[in-house]
Amino acid sequence: MKRIKLTVAYDGTNYHGWQVQPNADTIEGELNKAISELTGEQIEVIGASRTDAGVHALGNVAVFDTESRIPGEKFSHALNQRLPDDIIIQKSEEVDRDFHPRYQECRKTYEYTILNRRFPLPEYRNTAHFDYGNLDIEAMKKACKAFIGEHDFAGFCSAGAQVKTTVRTIYSLEVECMELGGVQRENHAEKKTECEKISYDVNIKTGEEQENNRLVNIKVDEERENNRLVNIKVDGGQENNRLIKIRVNGNGFLYNMVRIIAGTLLEVGKGNVAPEQMEDIIKSADRKEAGPTAPAKGLKLVEIRYV
């Protein structure tokens, strides 16, 4: 009997999470079926992280015991021939029989992706949370500092979680912003004449649902001749068109903890919570003080590194 470790990547869109459930498609269920078919044994894998419905992974870990004579490193190719296209074994290897993916000391890295622009993009519909607000990235980065270190994260855990302790250590928490490119809105009419030029800024409160009734600054350049308007140039400014990634590394995470961290940082970005409040929110250990749980589709388990 030998123990095989699998590094698993998957798109969680079409699955009811990792853990086997009756009458539901799950990642664990698909792995059990493929491995059992390959080995001729009744296999049940043990997973490191039981991700929720809609959550994705680049490097979740699972193990199973088998008497198969297939070399450990060969399982990845053989299983990928049997698994659906949205589940891929990145690596397979034989490990010590006492290796346990859930109880072994490790560091986990998660990433939460936000598409920040006026309208959604179809290619990100299953892998990023869409937010059209004018998010303050610097404020979000500043708020990250309060999370670093060992804290009681009871306020960042969904109700019903059964754990011995809510104390966890976060080694790093970063907010990265990648511009996708912008669209400059500009309307103007021109007339060649000697005239007075006037520039001023106008704040317009939009009524469009997509703009969330927020104030939008517009720059206006007027040209006047004998107090008569002969030319006007309106510059609507640069629309947000970016991907924001919240990346966190820690020794373990409570139920929905990363999604609640992401939801809280979004509240900071929107100006609803000041970065300076974050330390008190964590110390309160009160779920009501933290932000909402961000949607599952933006979350991805990037890596589990055993130490």
Residue ranges and their predicted role:
Residues 1-207, 215, 229-307:
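Structured-RNA-binding interfaces characteristic of tRNA pseudouridine synthases
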Residues 221-222, 235:
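Repetitive helical segments and hydrophobic/amphipathic motifs
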